[in-house]
Amino acid sequence: MEKIKVALVSLGCDKNRIDSELMLYKLNEEAELVKNPKEAQVIIVNTCGFIETAKEESINTILQMASYKKTHNCKVLVVTGCLTQRYKGELKELIPEMDIMLGVNDYDKLLESIKVFLKSGEKSFYHKYSDTKINEGNRILTTPTYTAYVRIAEGCNNFCTYCAIPRIRGKYRSRKKENILKEVENLAKQGVKEIILIAQDTTMYGIDIYGKKVLHELLRDISKVEGVKWIRLLYCYPEEITKELIEEIKNNDKVCKYLDLPIQQISNSVLKRMGRKTTKETIIDIIKKLRKEIEGITLRTSLIVGFPGETEGEFSELKEFVSDVKLDKLGVFKYSKEEGTSAALMEEQIDEEIKEKREEEIMILQQSISKDINKEKIGKIYEVIVEGTKEDMYYGRNYEMSPEIDGEIYFEKDENVKIGDIIKVKVTHSLEYDLIGVVYNELSK
């Protein structure tokens, strides 16, 4: 293929981002990558098909990119990702402007499909489903140079009643430890300091290929890689957290004292309807254990409000939990009715207006909790990875903050500080979600 200009628009989660980065590497061999789709002759949209708002964003983006065939330089429109895997037949009819459609296991066909279309105009529509294939290999990072996401497993075995991911991504399958370590070593050589481990469920890592959960072993091995400073864990199911994992987080200085626990709900009756393999008592017990065993640990969660049949009593129970447990970070999603899931067939679907009201109530409550938690940080000194500048301030994150979702620490510019540096910052002021401080040195003690 001649050096044709290609742009890739990536939507959705960071697992999708990794797929996009894998595609970019393959494309870079024979194409010129451009950031602005208006300049591109080939536009690739990597879609999300998880919840209704994500699907709408994906459809709107595809249609916008399709319009560039008339208004700009686009000759080939490629659509891939979770939406194409989930709605392959419907999309083909709905958007005839698509020239190539790939499922989540078809990225190896990307270059060849583009070449064929440019040569003959022949369209390609692949949507292979695989319970064995794992997308891995070299990537072109779309994150800042000091941070990278690393997927340790693909798919999911949980089959929660509201979630379509197992039907899109297949059953849970772990990557081999040696492949992950090789990837981390390559990333560290590129200057990456923060490794963020992701999967649909990171805590189940290894169960399928090693016969047991070995996330703690993986953390230990990654921490030995030269250049890696921080290792962050996302998507840790509380019921799967082992004592070995707790010990590793506690004793390994490179592992951030931070856990993302997607509990979704707290009422046992709602958890049962959701098909979750846990209980209120188990969730509260593991939170207490983590706080007792790991000093200074930050706990984040995501909640779903408006699940079918959610009563005022069940919602009050959730509010009481949020108020009593006071998790450090919290996000709320309104339940999204997804085709093909058993929850979509449940009676007593909740009105959108009630969902919005409940979402707002939880977030107002959490805002107050976060404000109080942040006040306690005044005077504390943190290691901060410097991310950028806004007006006359630098900003960055400490171990308590995951990229893009957890707030930032702002501090005055310092001529000795560069983006990507890890420095010490003393907190002087606090806001609801952000902190303000000064570079910590002899003068700021």
Curated annotation (Swiss-Prot):
The keyword Iron applies. Its EC number is 2.8.4.4. Residues 4-119 form the MTTase N-terminal domain. GO terms for cellular component: cytosol. InterPro entries: Elp3/MiaA/NifB-like_rSAM, Methylthiotransferase, Methylthiotransferase_CS, Methylthiotransferase_N, Methylthiotransferase_N_sf, NA-bd_OB-fold, Ribosomal_uS12_MeSTrfase_RimO, rSAM. Residues 375-441 form the TRAM domain. Keywords: 4Fe-4S, Cytoplasm, Iron, Iron-sulfur, Metal-binding, S-adenosyl-L-methionine, Transferase. CDD domains: Radical_SAM (cd01335). [4Fe-4S] cluster 2 binds at C156, C160, C163. [4Fe-4S] cluster 1 binds at C13, C48, C82. GO terms for molecular function: 4 iron, 4 sulfur cluster binding; aspartic acid methylthiotransferase activity; metal ion binding; protein methylthiotransferase activity. Residues 142-372 form the Radical SAM core domain. Pfam families: Radical_SAM (PF04055), TRAM_2 (PF18693), UPF0004 (PF00919). It is found in: Cytoplasm. Belongs to the methylthiotransferase family. RimO subfamily. NCBIfam families: 30S ribosomal protein S12 methylthiotransferase RimO, MiaB/RimO family radical SAM methylthiotransferase. Catalyzes the methylthiolation of an aspartic acid residue of ribosomal protein uS12. This is Ribosomal protein uS12 methylthiotransferase RimO. It comes from Clostridium botulinum (strain Langeland / NCTC 10281 / Type F).
